Amino acid sequence: VSDKGKDKTFVPPQERNIAMVFQEYALYPNMTVRKNMSFALETKKAPKAEIEKRVTAMSSMLGLDELLDRRPAQLSGGQRQRVALGRALVRDPQVFLLDEPLGNLDAKLRDQVRYELKKIQTKLGITTVYVTHDQTEAMTMADHIVLMKDGHIMQQGTPDDLYSHPNCLFVASFVGTPQINKLKCKVVAEEGAIKLVCDQLTLNAPDDVKELLKLYVGKEVIIGIRPSELVMAPEGQGELNGVVDSVEPLGDGFHVYLNVDGQVLVAKIAGGSTVIGKSLSLNVEKGKMHLFDSVTEERLNVG
């Protein structure tokens, strides 16, 4: 483990200058907010003027000025979380470690604190390692994501890298809401054309992957299509023509579940409207079909 080029592997934890905040706030119940925030600095015998300066600056940044004389029992969940953050940040750490810090918050408060955390991190410029099982938190907050499974790194990169260019089926399925549509298809060469036969559903191979699929004729592949990459087409003239099975209104659009020859696909449609039982046609956005090996589940196409 290195920090700014210095090997910290065998440095005692208390000397690494890493601040940590966990799902449980672990505030001292008998201390005020002010005392909770200043305690670590006091134990290091920092000058009183410096302690006051740091606590005042951090409480102002986190909106805690009016809460400094209260105890944890008098605070809401969101306020306690901000106190825990403030207590860590006043130390001026080199690295900030957050382990599922929003796990105890309700959905509305989680959105608010997520926004505040991102703003604070950007303002302070502290390298932050944020551990979460929530892909929405990872996608909305991270500059760089490391996606792990069973202790192994599956892929790392920017949020867009993982969303638009997943290197395997696991990554493609984990990132994105609703989950990516997955179809196991057999690659067939028919009268000079390359087709994807998925049970009763048959698709013409998109131009950008035809050459690649020629190598897999007679074999199975898995195609992945994100709901947001399906667009409406004139009725009966789409690559996917089916009947609406279910609709989830979102206000500014809707999720539509389309039964296409026995395969149910979900599409994320902006604007417009549709009803259950109606015929609907969809196209896949050009260059947006993801191909995976049916055995290794690794990505086949580079795009």
Placement of each model-derived feature along the sequence:
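Non-catalytic connector elements of ABC transporters
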Residues: 178-184, 190-303
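A generic local structural motif
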Residues: 4-8, 114-117, 208-209
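ABC ATPase NBD Q-loop/coupling interface
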Residues: 1-16, 46-51
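Short beta-alpha junctions and helix-cap segments that line functional grooves
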Residues: 8, 158, 170, 269-270
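ABC ATPase nucleotide-binding domains
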Residues: 17-19, 23-170
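ABC transporter nucleotide-binding domain
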Residues: 159-190
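Residues that scaffold the ATP/ADP-binding catalytic core of kinase and kinase-like folds
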Residues: 4, 105, 112, 165, ...
